[in-house]
């Protein structure tokens, strides 16, 4: 198991996110002072597109660990974790603008948020026959998404 985690960790550090996925600014959020990426990865042999966000470490992105975050369910958007729990910005109840989250996990790690399964959050599932999900096909899609981005 440790070997697998080591390979995944090395792959995460050596991966170059597509420049087209780089986020340079967001409305109603403080300036971005770290690598922030948002994009899609296709699931092979389907029309599904899984949305991801990657918040690179604010400390040392080339040597800090990677955390892959999936909100519970399956069926709950991982953007809730990004926006209200441990992401680089937070939007508290009743607020209309994001604030910098001083306790963000990306202070010391590269955090990869996965919107799973397809059809949840910003993920796309245009063929409704592919949208029914259970633990097994969600796990398969999650693995494909992680392998595609790392």
Language model features with spans:
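Catalytic-loop region of hydrolases
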Residues: 2-66
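N-terminal cap/lid subdomain of alpha/beta-hydrolase-fold enzymes
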Residues: 49-140, 147
């Amino acid at each position: 198991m440790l070997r697998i985690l080591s390979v995944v960790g090395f792959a995460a550090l050596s991966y170059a996110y597509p420049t087209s996925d780089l986020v340079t600014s967001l409305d109603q959020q403080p300036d971005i002072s770290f690598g922030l990426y948002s994009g899609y990865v296709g699931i092979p042999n389907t029309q599904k597109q899984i949305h991801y966000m990657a918040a690179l470490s604010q400390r040392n992105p080339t040597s800090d660990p990677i955390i892959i975050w999936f909100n519970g369910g399956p069926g709950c958007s991982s953007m809730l974790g990004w926006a209200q729990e441990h992401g680089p910005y937070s939007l508290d109840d009743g607020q209309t603008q994001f604030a910098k989250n001083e306790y963000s996990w990306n202070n010391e790690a590269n955090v990869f948020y996965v919107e799973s399964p397809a059809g949840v959050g910003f993920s796309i599932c245009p063929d409704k026959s592919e949208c029914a999900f259970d633990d097994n096909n969600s796990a398969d899609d999650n693995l494909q998404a992680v392998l595609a981005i790392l």
